[in-house]
Amino acid sequence: MAAAFGRCCRVLRSISRFHWRSQHTKADRQREPGLGFSFEFTEQQKEFQATARKFAREEIIPVAAEYDKTGEYPVPLIRRAWELGLMNPHIPQNCGGLGLGTFDACLISEELAYGCTGVQTAIEGNSLGQMPIIIAGNEQQKKKYLGRMTEEPLMCAYCVTEPGAGSDVAGIKTKAEKKGDEYIINGQKMWITNGGKASWYFLLARSDPDPKAPANKAFTGFIVEADTPGIQIGRKELNMGQRCSDTRGIVFEDVKVLKENVLIGDGAGFKIAMGAFDKTRPTVSSGAVGLAQRALDEATKYALERKTFGKLLIEHQAISFMLAEMAMKVELARMSYQRAAWEVDSGRRNTYYASIAKAFAGDIANQLATDAVQIFGGNGFNTEYPVEKLMRDAKIYQIYEGTSQIQRLIIAREHIGKYKS
């Protein structure tokens, strides 16, 4: 019975993927480059959005609080998202994937995050892990590591952050020593999303022992199988928010990696790692917008039901003005990630817009979650109501994939550079 059900799910998923892939190809042929923004989604985009929205509201929201309480990894939801074609949207068509653009992936991400950003991060942690291979892998690497992720719901992880090197990626200490046709990896990584669930990792390590070597030549990117001898996976971290997401430290001790698992070549790793951020930060930003929209909706619903001083909360100008400010902010944050995603899909370097979207949406998610708690009053401080979880979940958006302060450094650098030129 179970085997038959599994075969049925695979057939249905294949049909769904074929339909969406066909529609995506048709839409691409019809799209004329250079026309600028369109505020009307394509039929395919509407379909993706509707599917993700239905999944979030009917399957994620009812169990989100329990996953937050237990910290259990949401395997059933991950499998279901995979079956629906909502997982791994960036995998190219020639590897069996949908080959969606960043804009389309962002629409899915926003809807999933509306349901629960912990679940959304668990589902979409793959996007960051996959991106270095998508942008820099050879055909053999892509088919081997991306192709198998379209055959079953496997996970991967992006192993860059270390205990002493977070925003300062150039400061990582993990070393890769070349010996013949293989590399010996030694070092420690920290705060790795999907670290204990991944089947393989993208790993950034220092391959040039010269401490004065520039970052764009000192680091190499590797694909490392998670079951390679010498890898020690740490305990699941107990985080403030997004608790069902799997976050761990990983130790690499004399881990052997074949040269065929090097991306591009020696010294190309830093550029690859940073290039991945340009493509994934819009998606992360869309997750922050999904949380912000949820905060606005919950606050509005509560204000329409709760009475104080003899009338509904929403009838008090102080509250209605708060909701107006929240609505303004969420719409502007949405526009920021859509602009950044559009830049990616147009084939342009989007570092500037990606950082604006990441910083702004992360800040807005925190502001709206805080405002929602305020509107709920004492109830907002209690776990029986949804907004306290939103407030805890929101904070990480100002930290992971580059802190809000780092984004501002990038924005300033890009802005000043454009001004001088």
UniProtKB/Swiss-Prot annotation:
The EC number(s) given in the record are: 1.3.8.7
Transit peptide span, please give it. 1-25
The record's subcellular location field reads: Mitochondrion matrix
Keyword Flavoprotein in annotation: yes
Question: By its UniProt entry, which PROSITE patterns does this protein fall under?
Answer: ACYL_COA_DH_1 (PS00072), ACYL_COA_DH_2 (PS00073)
Per the UniProt record, the source organism is: Macaca fascicularis (Crab-eating macaque)
List the GO cellular component terms. Answer: mitochondrial matrix
Modified positions (N6-succinyllysine) in chain numbering: 69, 179, 212, 217, 259, 271
Q: What is this protein called?
A: Medium-chain specific acyl-CoA dehydrogenase, mitochondrial
Q: What would be one Pfam family of this protein?
A: Acyl-CoA_dh_M
Quaternary organization: Homotetramer. Interacts with the heterodimeric electron transfer flavoprotein ETF.
Catalyzed reactions per annotation: a medium-chain 2,3-saturated fatty acyl-CoA + oxidized [electron-transfer flavoprotein] + H(+) = a medium-chain (2E)-enoyl-CoA + reduced [electron-transfer flavoprotein]; pentanoyl-CoA + oxidized [electron-transfer flavoprotein] + H(+) = (2E)-pentenoyl-CoA + reduced [electron-transfer flavoprotein]; hexanoyl-CoA + oxidized [electron-transfer flavoprotein] + H(+) = (2E)-hexenoyl-CoA + reduced [electron-transfer flavoprotein]; octanoyl-CoA + oxidized [electron-transfer flavoprotein] + H(+) = (2E)-octenoyl-CoA + reduced [electron-transfer flavoprotein]
- Cofactor(s) listed in the protein's UniProt record: FAD
User: According to the UniProt entry, which residues carry N6-acetyllysine?
Assistant: 69, 212, 217, 259, 271, 279, 301
Instruction: Determine the domain of life of the protein's source.
Output: Eukaryota
Q: How is it modified after translation?
A: Acetylated. Could occur at proximity of the cofactor-binding sites and reduce the catalytic activity. Could be deacetylated by SIRT3.
Which sites bind FAD? 158-167, 191-193, 306-308, 316-317, 374-378, 402-405
Pathway(s) this gene product operates in, as recorded in its UniProt entry: Lipid metabolism; mitochondrial fatty acid beta-oxidation
Q: Which PANTHER family match?
A: MEDIUM-CHAIN SPECIFIC ACYL-COA DEHYDROGENASE, MITOCHONDRIAL, MEDIUM-CHAIN SPECIFIC ACYL-COA DEHYDROGENASE, MITOCHONDRIAL-RELATED
The record places the active site at 401
